[in-house]
């Protein structure tokens, strides 16, 4: 059961559009100052009567009501209501009763728009379709300083890749691409140069999985792997999957994908005139830098934790999470025995910076997310500063601790069986979670007994 509250205003869309149009619900004034309330109920006898009884007990006058089957859950109905403006003094207690007594999920989206407005976020993996094409730069268009800007053949090729991404929908196989001889040559140069460094510079997890990618996904100097093959491999390892994207997404949208273990991945390759340079993520960066680590369970969980922390977070915290992502998933270093190795994709896909980051030139600091989240960084040259994690598990716990500081009126968890994000803000949801944990603990205890016997 879910509910959305508006005070002194109406929704920016009617019930028929709820959750489908904008990232924020607007706070506009209506004529009588009524409080607008949207809630959803399981389709069962007496469900709505409980809510109406609650209104009656608190002397709340219901002036308007609409209903429709929920688009998010086929077993629920959604109700759009206007409450008389005199209900405002008891609105807080009503919300508390909806949560605790009836089991409602209540989102106070705009009681105070400046402080409490919660950005829209995807609740199902299918909803990633809504923003996957809202790229910020590049795609089929290139900036004037891009190596391929004056190359009409390259620009036409980029449009082909962009069209693939724009037409893709969740659940479809990723279209296969016949890469040109020049594209394979560019890949080969990057692949050969970087592979020579991995043994001495990359972390254990990267080096452990790389031979498996060569064996099962066609990672070779003379072959650019197909995203669909790599995505299938990832799903068998950690549940992560690839999704083609035409260019750079906003930080909020990109991190939101990680919450569902979806990595938005480019399919095009950098311009052949500069095989060791790219101003944007390309397939070399994605497959050589990111994919090996997404195949590791601990790192996959760490990445998903960053994504889950971003859901519904205020804009200033999205910026902090994006900075944490930059200094970990993109440019992170980790301890490995007495040595320090690279695990960030930006390092593992850059021949020059992979050598530089482990030299005596940059400054190395321990990973402390409160400080890391506020650290400025450069996107045009090698980083002057890198953060060193004790381990992926340690980094994961630090992300969880940091997520607890994000001011949002709920917690979230990902259900891998339904591929949905569950909002945990009422006792009913917590009971379901407790039952799930209890079941897992039971399996653990049973397995321990088997081992002891």
From Swiss-Prot:
Names of required cofactors: Fe(2+)
Regulation (activators, inhibitors): N-terminal region of PAH is thought to contain allosteric binding sites for phenylalanine and to constitute an 'inhibitory' domain that regulates the activity of a catalytic domain in the C-terminal portion of the molecule.
Chain coiled-coil ranges: none
Top EC class of this enzyme: oxidoreductase
Keywords for this protein: Acetylation, Allosteric enzyme, Disease variant, Iron, Metal-binding, Monooxygenase, Oxidoreductase, Phenylalanine catabolism, Phosphoprotein
Residues modified to Phosphoserine: 16
PROSITE patterns in the cross-refs: ACT (PS51671), BH4_AAA_HYDROXYL_1 (PS00367), BH4_AAA_HYDROXYL_2 (PS51410)
GO molecular function, one term: phenylalanine 4-monooxygenase activity
CDD domains for this protein: ACT_PAH (cd04931), eu_PheOH (cd03347)
Transmembrane domains' residue ranges: none
Keyword Phosphoprotein: yes
Result for mutant: residue 106 to A: Mutant mice have mild features of phenylketonuria
Catalysed conversion reaction: (6R)-L-erythro-5,6,7,8-tetrahydrobiopterin + L-phenylalanine + O2 = (4aS,6R)-4a-hydroxy-L-erythro-5,6,7,8-tetrahydrobiopterin + L-tyrosine
Recorded family membership: Belongs to the biopterin-dependent aromatic amino acid hydroxylase family.
Oligomeric and partner information: Homodimer and homotetramer.
Function summary: Catalyzes the hydroxylation of L-phenylalanine to L-tyrosine.
Protein name listed in UniProt: Phenylalanine-4-hydroxylase
Gene: Pah
């Amino acid at each position: 059961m879910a509910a959305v509250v508006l005070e002194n205003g109406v929704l920016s869309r009617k019930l028929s559009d709820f959750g489908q149009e904008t990232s924020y619900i607007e706070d506009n004034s209506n004529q009588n100052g009524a409080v607008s309330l949207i809630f959803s109920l399981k389709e069962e006898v007496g469900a709505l009567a409980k809510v109406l009884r609650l209104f009656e007990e608190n002397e709340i006058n219901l002036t308007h009501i609409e209903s429709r089957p929920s688009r998010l859950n086929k077993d629920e109905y959604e109700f759009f209501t206007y409450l008389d403006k005199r209900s405002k003094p008891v609105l807080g207690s009503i919300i508390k009763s909806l949560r605790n007594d009836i089991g409602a999920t209540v989102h106070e989206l705009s009681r105070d728009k400046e402080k409490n407005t919660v950005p829209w976020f995807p609740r199902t993996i299918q909803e990633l379709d809504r923003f996957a094409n809202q790229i910020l730069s590049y795609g089929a268009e290139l900036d004037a300083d891009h190596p391929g800007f004056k190359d009409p053949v390259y620009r036409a090729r980029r449009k082909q890749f962009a069209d693939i991404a724009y037409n893709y929908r969740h659940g479809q196989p990723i279209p296969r691409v016949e890469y040109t001889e020049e594209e394979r040559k560019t890949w080969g140069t990057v692949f050969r140069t970087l592979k020579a460094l991995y043994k001495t510079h990359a972390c254990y997890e990267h080096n452990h999985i790389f031979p498996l990618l060569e064996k099962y996904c066609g990672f070779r100097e003379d072959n650019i792997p197909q995203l669909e093959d790599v995505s299938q491999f990832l799903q068998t390892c950690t549940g992560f999957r690839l999704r083609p994207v035409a260019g750079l997404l906003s930080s909020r949208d990109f991190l939101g994908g990680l919450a569902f273990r979806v990595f938005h991945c480019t399919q095009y390759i950098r311009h052949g005139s500069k095989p060791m340079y790219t101003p944007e993520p390309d397939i070399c960066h994605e497959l050589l830098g990111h994919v090996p680590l997404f195949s590791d369970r601990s790192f996959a969980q760490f990445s998903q934790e960053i994504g889950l922390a971003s859901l519904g977070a205020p804009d200033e915290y999205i910026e902090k999470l994006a900075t944490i992502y930059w200094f970990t998933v993109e440019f992170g270093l980790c301890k490995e025995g007495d040595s320090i190795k690279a695990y960030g994709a930006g390092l593992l896909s850059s021949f020059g910076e992979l050598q530089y980051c482990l030299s005596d030139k940059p400054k190395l600091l321990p990973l402390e997310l409160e400080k890391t989240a506020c650290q400025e960084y450069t996107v045009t040259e090698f980083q002057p500063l890198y953060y060193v994690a004790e381990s992926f598990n340690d980094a994961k716990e630090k992300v969880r601790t940091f997520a607890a500081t994000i001011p949002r009126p709920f917690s979230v968890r990902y259900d891998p069986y339904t591929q949905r994000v569950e909002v945990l803000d009422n006792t009913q949801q917590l009971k379901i979670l407790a039952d799930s944990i209890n079941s897992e603990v039971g399996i653990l205890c049973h397995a321990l007994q088997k081992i002891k016997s």
